[in-house]
Regions:
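Acidic (Asp/Glu-rich) sequence patches and key acidic residues
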Residues: 1-138
């Protein structure tokens, strides 16, 4: 799980193939800089998965990965200030959606501090005019 930043002029929308959904993303890996990483935080990943599905007008969930679309391995979701407001409210309230998966581990109360640190970094990046994306490989 990771968040990247890039210059808005380096954003493209790509169709990743028949088994993947189109996604907005940095034009190349050289155009992006790592902003934040997480490990074994399935609840946060579920929150970003739900955000991606809403933004793309899709239905499904991560638990339906074998039956329908999944948010994994190449899709990116662009994060706005409004998204960060919603995420911050969910983190502060302990209201991230619960999720579990093979090798995912579990989210812990200690993740809250790290999530809030990410939100602060993402807000700074947006204020600098950068684009912020979330993605993951699982």
């Amino acid at each position: 799980m990771f968040a990247l930043t890039c210059d808005p002029s380096k954003v493209t929308r790509q169709d990743l193939g028949v088994d993947q959904m189109p996604t907005e993303m940095p034009a190349s890996t050289g155009d992006a800089k790592m902003l934040h990483t997480w490990r074994k935080h399935p609840d946060l990943h579920q929150w970003f998965t739900d955000l991606y599905f809403r933004k793309e007008g899709l239905t499904g969930s991560i638990t339906q990965a074998e039956m329908g679309p999944a948010f994994n391995a190449g899709q990116f979701v662009r994060i706005t200030e409004h998204d960060l407001d919603q995420l911050e409210a969910a983190v502060e309230a302990g209201a991230l959606p619960k999720a579990a998966g093979f090798f995912w581990g579990v989210s812990t109360p200690e993740d809250k501090k790290d999530d809030l640190a990410f939100i602060r970094k993402a807000r700074k990046a947006l204020k600098k005019g950068l684009v912020v994306f979330y993605s993951s490989w699982w």
